[in-house]
Amino acid sequence: MRAVIQRVSEASVTVDHKVCAVMRDGLLILLGIENEDNEEDIDWLCRKIINMRIFNDEDEVMNESLKSVDGDAIIVSQFTLHASTKKGNRPSYIKAAKPEVAEPLYLKFISKFQNELGKDVGSGIFGGDMKVSLLNDGPVTIIIDSKEKR
């Protein structure tokens, strides 16, 4: 399971000209799910993201976490995070989980994230053609892969 997390001042997700999530001051999380991903990956990645100290304290040092600053979040499914570009010019998505596997894991990730954070978060529409708007803060952008925890 791979996540690209971006610290943002604001973000929103729109599907079919309807806004389905809006937030201020927190994280926009792009989530890619692989064939082998499971609930252990969900647990580890949720804890890692929520507790990662990437928000500034009063001295402008990154010592605060999403949880400690009571920040918001939007989680967006993005299978293209598992693109392979080794051969040719057309990316291969063979490592990305099929929708019937990925969607339940995506929904479990959102549920676990909300439970760990202690508040509701926004999300995109799984498989939807989404328009994601954001205003980076920093910028701070970090890639986290649950396969690298071992």
Curated annotation (Swiss-Prot):
GO cellular component, one term: cytoplasm
Enzyme class: hydrolase
Biological-process GO terms, alphabetical: D-amino acid catabolic process
Motif (Gly-cisPro motif, important for rejection of L-amino acids): 138-139
Cysteine disulfide partners in this protein: none
Subcellular location, principal: cytoplasm
InterPro entries from the UniProt entry: Daa-tRNA_deacyls_DTD, DTD-like_sf
An annotated Gene Ontology molecular function: Gly-tRNA(Ala) deacylase activity
Keyword field: Cytoplasm, Hydrolase, RNA-binding, tRNA-binding
Enzyme Commission designation: 3.1.1.96
Family annotation (Gene3D superfamilies): D-tyrosyl-tRNA(Tyr) deacylase
Keyword tRNA-binding (UniProt): yes
Keyword Hydrolase in annotation: yes
Subcellular location: Cytoplasm
Domain of life: Bacteria
Catalysed conversion reaction: glycyl-tRNA(Ala) + H2O = tRNA(Ala) + glycine + H(+); a D-aminoacyl-tRNA + H2O = a tRNA + a D-alpha-amino acid + H(+)
Pfam family, one: Tyr_Deacylase
HAMAP family for the chain: Deacylase_Dtd
Subunit structure: Homodimer.
PANTHER family recorded: D-AMINOACYL-TRNA DEACYLASE 1 (PTHR10472:SF5), D-TYROSYL-TRNA TYR DEACYLASE (PTHR10472)
Function comment: An aminoacyl-tRNA editing enzyme that deacylates mischarged D-aminoacyl-tRNAs. Also deacylates mischarged glycyl-tRNA(Ala), protecting cells against glycine mischarging by AlaRS. Acts via tRNA-based rather than protein-based catalysis; rejects L-amino acids rather than detecting D-amino acids in the active site. By recycling D-aminoacyl-tRNA to D-amino acids and free tRNA molecules, this enzyme counteracts the toxicity associated with the formation of D-aminoacyl-tRNA entities in vivo and helps enforce protein L-homochirality.
Similarity comment: Belongs to the DTD family.
Entry domain remark: A Gly-cisPro motif from one monomer fits into the active site of the other monomer to allow specific chiral rejection of L-amino acids.
Protein name in the entry: D-aminoacyl-tRNA deacylase
